[in-house]
């Protein structure tokens, strides 16, 4: 029985889809004005994990993750670069997809772009105006009337009175209330725009997600996800817009993943502690980065450091050493490990406990490796099966363990030396065999001999 922590209720709830076995999930995606940073990677991996487990559990999932391809940041960056906004976003979308491929992220079923849904935004804004939840002051903008929506603040637990007292809000004489937020922005010189009933302009950020989600999944759906930094105001405003427009509950459950922290501080450009996914993947194996992101509970903050990456690498090496030398066969045996893994994942996608189960499974594989190799091979298949839920352990063991050799040692040279050493051993030329081993050790290569075969990896 799957339970999910619902940010809306602030409790774990038994997950009950709205429509039988069908699950509809919407996740706020990237604003594509720059290369994706590791915080984006956290969200990608977190909801990829949710996707994998829901499907593994037999649910028929429709996963939608949007792309914000028009925004102040996009316009500013395009102007800085001297290119059109759509040329910038096309380039960044391609880069994002490449980052996802390297991190083994499954493609969403739908990936709507804001600029493809302008007509739908016009329609929802007009509905809000007709119902009295929005107003056009005549300057080309349209604003949402926050004070009219009775449930405002129910996600973030913020009260309108406190927001008015505590918020630092720039005075905008066009607004009826300082808390009102923009649904449609009137055109400014040099900016891209679309025609609308209120004059040329472009959509506000919040209305984009309300329209794309309901267009793709319907007026009510099962799960809405995103980073914890989006809970307020973005997700709060989505609820206000969508429920005012439709009169129905917007999303049944809200899931928010934690932030990436560096030395205790949130990763951000302003603190100059910002790492793009591609920068990190230039240094670390993609599976190491993915394991770092998936091994912590999705709601927890992750501290990014050299030590944490080394720990992730060490964990994967233990897994792959257990798989090494065993044939790829169908998963067999280890039902108790499957049960424990399922219990962990059904408890709000509890990956720390699930990873602990994998370590126990590794110990059992190693225990049986010599005494019952067939049983060990079946359990190795089970390890890969469970690892696939986390998006790891699908590589050949030798390929992972040798990763990083390029630029450090010549793999062809290593293989030639190993063959020369095997010949020396066959000739019982032990001195030459030892000399070659010493040469390889000096190169940072560790040899492992077993049953007439020799494999190698780089030393830690």
Swiss-Prot record:
Keywords: Aminoacyl-tRNA synthetase, ATP-binding, Cytoplasm, Ligase, Metal-binding, Nucleotide-binding, Protein biosynthesis, Zinc
E.C. numbers: 6.1.1.16
Motif stretch ('HIGH' region): 30-40
GO terms for MF: ATP binding; cysteine-tRNA ligase activity; zinc ion binding
Protein location: Cytoplasm
A Gene Ontology BP annotation from the UniProt entry: cysteinyl-tRNA aminoacylation
Enzyme class at the top of the EC tree: ligase
Catalysis: reaction(s): tRNA(Cys) + L-cysteine + ATP = L-cysteinyl-tRNA(Cys) + AMP + diphosphate
Record: residues binding ATP: 269
Cofactors, names only: Zn(2+)
Sites where the protein binds Zn(2+): 28, 209, 234, 238
InterPro entries from the UniProt entry: Cys-tRNA-ligase, Cys-tRNA-synt_Ia_DALR, Cys-tRNA/MSH_ligase, CysS_C, Rossmann-like_a/b/a_fold, tRNA-synt_1_cat_dom, tRNAsynth_Ia_anticodon-bd
Cofactor binding note: Binds 1 zinc ion per subunit.
'KMSKS' region, short sequence motif: residues: 266-270
The keyword ATP-binding is annotated on this UniProt entry: yes
Gene Ontology cellular component list: cytosol
Gene3D superfamilies named in the record: Cysteine-tRNA ligase, C-terminal anti-codon recognition domain (1.20.120.1910), HUPs (3.40.50.620)
Superkingdom: Bacteria
Xref: NCBIfam families: cysS (TIGR00435)
UniProt similarity note: Belongs to the class-I aminoacyl-tRNA synthetase family.
Subunit structure: Monomer.
Name of the protein: Cysteine--tRNA ligase
Gene source species: Pseudomonas putida (strain W619)
């Amino acid at each position: 029985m799957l339970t999910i922590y619902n940010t809306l209720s602030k409790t774990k709830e038994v997950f009950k889809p709205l429509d039988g076995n069908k699950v509809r999930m919407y996740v706020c995606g990237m604003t594509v004005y720059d290369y994706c940073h590791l915080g984006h990677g956290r969200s990608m991996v977190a909801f990829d994990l949710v996707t994998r487990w829901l499907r593994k559990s037999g649910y028929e999932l429709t996963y939608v993750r949007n792309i914000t391809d028009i925004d102040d940041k996009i316009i500013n960056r395009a102007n800085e670069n001297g290119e059109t906004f759509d040329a910038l976003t096309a380039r960044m979308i391609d880069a994002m997809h490449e980052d996802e491929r390297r991190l083994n992220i499954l493609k969403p079923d739908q990936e709507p772009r804001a600029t493809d849904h302008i007509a739908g935004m016009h329609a929802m804004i007009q509905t809000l105006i007709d119902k009295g939840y929005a107003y056009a002051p005549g300057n080309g903008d349209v604003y949402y009337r926050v004070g009219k929506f009775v449930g405002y603040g129910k996600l973030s637990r913020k009260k309108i009175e406190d927001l008015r007292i505590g918020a630092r809000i720039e005075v905008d004489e066009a607004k009826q209330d300082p808390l009102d937020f923009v649904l449609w922005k009137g055109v400014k010189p040099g900016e891209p725009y679309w025609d609308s009933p209120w004059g040329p302009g472009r959509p506000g950020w919040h209305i984009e997600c309300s329209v794309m989600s309901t267009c793709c999944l319907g007026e009510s759906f099962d799960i809405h996800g995103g980073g914890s930094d989006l809970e307020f105001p973005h997700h709060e405003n989505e609820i206000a817009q969508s429920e005012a427009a439709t009169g129905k509950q917007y999303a049944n459950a809200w899931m928010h993943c934690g932030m990436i922290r560096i030395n205790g501080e949130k990763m951000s450009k302003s603190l100059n502690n910002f790492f793009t996914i591609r920068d990190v993947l230039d240094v670390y194996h993609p599976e190491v980065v993915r394991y770092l992101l998936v091994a912590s509970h999705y709601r927890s903050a992750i501290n990014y450091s050299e030590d944490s990456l080394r720990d992730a690498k060490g964990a994967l090496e233990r897994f792959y050493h257990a798989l090494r030398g065993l044939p790829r066969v169908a998963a067999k045996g280890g039902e108790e490990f499957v049960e424990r893994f399922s219990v962990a994942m059904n408890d709000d996608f509890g990956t720390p406990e699930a990873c602990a189960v994998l370590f126990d499974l590794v110990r059992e594989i190693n225990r049986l490796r010599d005494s019952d190799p067939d049983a060990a091979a079946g359990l190795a298949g089970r390890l890969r099966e469970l690892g696939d839920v986390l998006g790891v352990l699908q590589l050949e063991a030798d390929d992972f363990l040798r990763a990083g050799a390029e630029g450090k040692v010549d793999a062809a040279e290593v293989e030639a030396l190993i063959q020369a050493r095997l010949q020396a051993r066959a000739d019982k030329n032990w001195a030459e065999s030892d000399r070659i081993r010493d040469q390889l050790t000096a190169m940072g290569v560790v040899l492992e001999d077993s049953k007439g075969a020799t494999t190698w990896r780089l030393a830690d």
